[in-house]
């Protein structure tokens, strides 16, 4: 298994278990890596530490629920692993700059964190040869 495949597998695991407790050690064991190496690799490929990523994905799922249902803020937060209203409100406000209550009232557009694609799809480019991508020439 390539390193990026282990991270892809862990991202899928996270998505499927956002409503449960997710520890870095459990994720590392799930993909067969040491916790130390897993954390370094995850940060390098996802550009976020593991628990920060989990928090951002949980916030995104809560926002999705608040937009599409009449669920109470506290219930949505508890469903996605936040331990209390205060804990959720703090995380929400630090991330988005508004309280969950103000969000629910106005439903402004927020830039939520989506599951990244970490597969190693790339194009080899010869140096000195222009590359055309979407009507843009990269030299």
Could you say what each language-model-derived stretch is?
Residues 38, 42, 87-88, 92:
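Short hydrophobic/aromatic patch on the recognition helix
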Residues 1-2, 90-139:
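…primarily DNA-binding HTH/wHTH and HhH modules…
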Residues 11-16, 28-29, 37, 98:
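Recognition helices and adjacent regulatory flanks at domain boundaries
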Residues 4, 8-25, 44-80, 107-124:
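Terminal helix-turn-helix DNA-binding modules in bacterial transcription factors
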Residues 33, 82-83:
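The short coil/loop that forms the "turn" connecting the two helices of the helix-turn-helix
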């Amino acid at each position: 298994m390539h390193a990026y495949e282990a991270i892809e597998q862990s991202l899928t695991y996270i998505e499927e278990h956002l409503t449960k407790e997710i520890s870095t050690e459990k994720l590392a064991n799930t993909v067969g890596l040491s916790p130390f190496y897993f954390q370094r690799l995850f940060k390098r490929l996802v550009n976020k530490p593991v628990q920060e990523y989990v928090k951002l994905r949980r916030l995104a799922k809560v926002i999705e629920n608040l937009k599409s249902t009449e669920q109470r803020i506290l219930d949505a937060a508890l469903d996605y692993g936040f331990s209390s209203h205060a804990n959720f409100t703090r995380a929400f406000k630090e991330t988005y700059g508004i309280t969950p209550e103000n969000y629910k009232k106005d439903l402004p557009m927020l830039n939520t964190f989506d599951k990244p694609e970490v597969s190693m799809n790339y194009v080899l480019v010869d140096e000195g040869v222009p590359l055309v991508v979407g009507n843009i020439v990269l030299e």
